[in-house]
């Protein structure tokens, strides 16, 4: 049995609101295996973004355990959590968050150089990913010169630049029109499968969810099979 790329065990997350406590996650259990693409669905306000933030080590759970590639994350220092994020995780958000003054290729080079990769191999990796996304002719364009779909495809390339083991995506096509969303989502699936990653992708779109390997629903603070 392969080591899960991501495992949550009885994860809870509560927030204080004055004298009241808001329980967003109430014992979430989830495993995502290497090479598996899992859709995370649920109504607005169910806590999908909170769950992804915890999976990405950007928030700490109130209780429970998060394991990334078999590594228990609860007692890690902030420096160690940062390294684990850098080396094991990739993130795609609803908005692309590209650096406007840099070209498409440079946006993909930056996280690699932060990780200690030299500029030449970083540029080669950027060119490889952009080619897979059908953007070779756009690699020298800045974000403002790209369409919304192209910007999001560059953001996906950036997320995969450091060859993560796990991709986390929060409504990655939510800002796009239906036709563009379809093209971007298919490109995302093709690239994730080609790279052999595990992925947890939050979406409100049931048609997109059904194209993934498995669907889980966040309901009343727990993760249940769809």
Swiss-Prot record:
The keyword Transport applies. ATP binds at residues 42-49. Keywords: ATP-binding, Cell inner membrane, Cell membrane, Membrane, Nucleotide-binding, Translocase, Transport. It is found in: Cell inner membrane. GO terms for cellular component: plasma membrane. It holds the Pfam family ABC_tran. InterPro entries: AAA+_ATPase, ABC_transporter-like_ATP-bd, ABC_transporter-like_CS, ABC_transpr_LolD-like, MacB-like_ATP-bd, P-loop_NTPase. GO terms for molecular function: ATP binding; ATP hydrolysis activity; transmembrane transporter activity. One of its GO terms (biological process) is protein localization to outer membrane. PANTHER family: IMPORT ATP-BINDING PROTEIN, LIPOPROTEIN-RELEASING SYSTEM ATP-BINDING PROTEIN LOLD. Belongs to the ABC transporter superfamily. Lipoprotein translocase (TC 3.A.1.125) family. This is Lipoprotein-releasing system ATP-binding protein LolD 1.
